[in-house]
């Protein structure tokens, strides 16, 4: 939870720059019955990102909205070779654009490519190498996702803000901020999102400040004056407390 809040704190300090340019979408790690190697996962991400850029979508390392690729094998065969067997299969890539906080799905796209190699991972790599960022199926998918995201938040903005407030009221500030950060800056009424982000973050600041002060008081009452001072030095100077 603290890690989430730290990430959101960093985002908050620069959200005007980040979101002024439009929609940001992350590319999540692939999922499926087969565990990809790190290199193969990175290869798929690198192959797909140009399709997002081509469609005017900014990519992000961290975002509530993400494209989740699911990989499965169709018509899988293992052909005996000389020294090593050759794995061949139709590799099915199911790309899903979703809000990770609400599980709202905006768009999906299935692309099937033939792959082969000396292992399942090699077969997937071979299939990935055949993917093209200019593939109309991929660019149409990203464009559809972009339009659906804008439409969703435009029509559900008040509901999103209300849900964020509900999270804040039960002190789940990270979840509340994550919802608000997923709103594109291009929608009308985004000023309300900006204001709510500031309000919830200040609530979080106040809670953290009070917690630190309580710890400092405990250390002080126990005679641990240096420890008390160290706690007080952790207080955000912009906090209201």
Q: What residue spans do the PLM features occupy?
A:
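Amphipathic beta-strand/beta-sheet edge segments enriched in Tyr/Trp
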Residues: 68-121
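Intrinsically disordered, low-complexity boundary segments flanking structured domains
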Residues: 11-12, 54-59, 94-100, 198-199
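N-terminal segment of the mature soluble domain
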Residues: 21-70
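Short, intrinsically disordered, charge-balanced linker/junction segments flanking boundaries
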Residues: 240-241
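Charged, low-complexity, helix/coiled-coil-prone segments
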Residues: 34-40, 64-80, 118-125, 171-177
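C-terminal/domain-edge helix-coil "capping" segments
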Residues: 106-107, 111-237
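Bacterial Sec-dependent N-terminal signal peptides
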Residues: 1-24
């Amino acid at each position: 939870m603290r890690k989430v809040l730290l990430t959101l704190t960093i985002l908050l300090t620069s959200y005007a720059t980040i979101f002024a340019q439009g929609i940001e979408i992350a590319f999540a790690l692939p999922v499926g019955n087969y565990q990809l190697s790190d290199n193969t996962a990175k290869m798929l991400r690198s192959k797909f990102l140009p399709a997002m850029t081509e469609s005017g979508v900014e990519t992000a390392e961290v975002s509530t909205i993400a494209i989740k690729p699911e990989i499965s094998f169709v018509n899988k065969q293992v052909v005996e070779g000389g020294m090593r067997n050759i794995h061949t299969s139709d590799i099915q890539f199911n790309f899903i654009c979703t809000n990770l906080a609400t599980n709202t799905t905006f768009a999906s796209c299935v692309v099937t490519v033939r792959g082969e190699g000396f292992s399942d991972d090699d077969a997937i790599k071979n299939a990935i190498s055949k993917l093209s960022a200019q593939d109309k199926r991929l660019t149409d998918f990203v464009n559809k996702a972009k339009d659906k995201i804008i439409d969703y938040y435009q029509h559900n903005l008040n509901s999103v803000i209300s849900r964020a407030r509900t999270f804040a009221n039960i002190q789940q500030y990270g979840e509340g901020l994550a919802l608000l950060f997923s709103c594109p800056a291009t929608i009308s009424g985004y000023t309300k999102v900006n204001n709510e982000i500031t309000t919830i973050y200040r609530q979080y600041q106040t809670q953290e400040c009070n917690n630190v002060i309580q710890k400092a008081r405990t250390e002080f009452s126990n005679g641990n004056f240096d420890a008390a001072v160290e706690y007080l030095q952790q207080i955000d100077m912009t906090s209201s407390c």
